[in-house]
Swiss-Prot record:
This is Argininosuccinate synthase. The gene is argG. HAMAP family: Arg_succ_synth_type1 (MF_00005). It comes from Thermotoga neapolitana (strain ATCC 49049 / DSM 4359 / NBRC 107923 / NS-E). The lineage of its organism: Bacteria, Thermotogati, Thermotogota, Thermotogae, Thermotogales. Keywords: Amino-acid biosynthesis, Arginine biosynthesis, ATP-binding, Cytoplasm, Ligase, Nucleotide-binding. The keyword Hydrolase does not apply. Belongs to the argininosuccinate synthase family. Type 1 subfamily. Pfam families: Arginosuc_syn_C, Arginosuc_synth.
Length: 409
């Protein structure tokens, strides 16, 4: 009996060649295709996998789970890698790998496989998830396999092999970028973008219009949260209302994209140490991130917020590096869930030509006291108390300065 392997399959050149290569090595290959919002013809992918040699093909719609259990979860901790990247690719990988493991267990497969390269982050994200969820599964990673690497040294070898084996190869002109698309974002890398001084042409962007070409009128959105989780969005101009999590997120993508929101061009640090330039389009998540952060301003205790903000970079790093299913992540998520207990209310944001600006907010759990904050009303605050407050904090500074002068003499 052949040993079984569950392959994370996209229908592209790399994973199609890997599928056939695994079949030739004597494996029974089960192809797994995850729909996380990419614009693909899934029936065509299924047909291609079967013709290439897969014994079975799983195609699953994971979009709703992706939104509720991954995108919204990352929002609780204000995940933002290196202060800029909203982690669209990184957040999707643990979900895909988790289902791959579950299918392997269901099918009695001994192996899981993926087509991620040996230079990127995805190989780590997939394999750490496999290890965390089922340490007994064996991993086949062809782009780190000496036998595979000796046979396929580049794209030309892959194309020649595919044609030799009757695997359909698209002859249409391919976009000169490496792209990853899901419900949260689309990323563009490689090609001309590898030159950090190259200014991307407008044709790089496929989701968002240029802010310069966006409508001349703002869109006002009222976004509601319960304990940090988005529950409703209302367009205050036309009355459109969305409460279903998936529909809500898709609608924010639509509004953000047509208003030029969510573009990012940055050089980031990959986990393995290589610097990489990425151009991202993340419209809906950008709107949510800004609105959520604004609501926290009136609902979170100062010290809780500052402590959470200290943990947020580590949280983002764990997601980026593939540690979604780790004990440290469990700890952080428990802390973030606690921090969001009062983050309930609504924020009105103005979406206009690439910008998202909060303009109003309300919460039944608000810690904002107009009388305390007023420049004109005391509101129970005795201003003379500030003198002692300042003196206490100044003591350390005075001692430091006087001591330093003594040393210098």
């Amino acid at each position: 009996m052949k040993e079984k392997v569950v392959l994370a399959y996209s229908g592209g050149l790399d994973t199609s060649v890997i599928l056939k290569w695994l079949c030739e090595k004597g494996f029974e290959v089960i192809a797994y295709v995850a729909n996380v919002g990419q614009k693909d013809d899934f029936e065509a992918i299924k047909e291609k996998a079967l013709k290439t040699g897969a014994s079975k093909v799983y195609i699953e719609d994971l979009r709703r789970e992706f939104v509720t259990d991954y995108i919204f979860t990352a929002l609780l901790g204000n995940a933002l890698y290196e202060g800029r990247y909203l982690l669209g690719t990184a957040i999707a990988r643990p979900l895909i790998a988790k289902r791959q493991v579950e299918i392997a267990e269901k099918e009695g497969a001994q192996y899981v496989a993926h087509g991620a390269t040996g230079k990127g982050n995805d190989q780590v994200r997939f394999e750490l998830t496999y290890a965390a969820l089922n340490p007994n599964l064996k991993v086949i990673s062809p782009w780190k396999d000496p036998e595979f690497l000796s046979r396929f040294k580049g794209r030309t070898d892959l194309i020649n092999y595919a044609r030799e084996k009757g695997i359909p190869v698209k002859v249409s002109k391919k976009r000169p970028y490496s792209e990853d698309e899901n419900l949260m974002h689309i990323s563009h890398e490689a090609g001309k973008l590898e030159d950090p001084m190259y200014i991307p042409d407008e044709d790089v962007f496929t989701w968002t219009v240029s802010p310069k070409e966006a409508p001349d009128e703002e869109t006002l959105l009222e976004i509601h949260f319960e304990k940090g989780v988005p529950v409703k969005v209302v367009n205050l101009k036309d009355g459109t209302e969305k409460t279903d999590p998936l529909e809500l997120f898709e609608y924010l993508n639509e509004i953000g994209a047509k208003n030029g929101v969510g573009r990012l061009d940055m050089v980031e640090n990959r986990f393995i140490g290589i610097k990489s330039r990425g151009v991202y389009e993340t419209p809906g998540a950008t709107i949510l991130w800004i609105a959520h952060r604004d609501l926290e301003g009136i609902t979170m205790d100062k010290e809780v917020m500052h402590l959470r903000d200290m943990l947020a970079p580590k949280f983002s790093e764990l997601i980026y590096n593939g540690f979604w299913f780790s004990p440290e992540m469990e700890f952080l998520l428990a802390a973030f869930k606690k921090s969001q207990e009062n983050v309930t209310g609504k924020v009105i944001v103005s979406v206009y030509k690439g910008n998202v600006m909060p303009v109003a907010r309300y919460s039944p759990c608000s810690l904002y006291n107009p009388e305390l904050s007023s420049m004109d009303v005391e509101g129970g605050f005795d201003a003379t108390d500030s003198k002692g407050f300042i003196n206490i904090h100044a003591l350390r500074l005075k001692v430091y300065r006087l001591t330093k002068k003594g040393y210098e003499k």
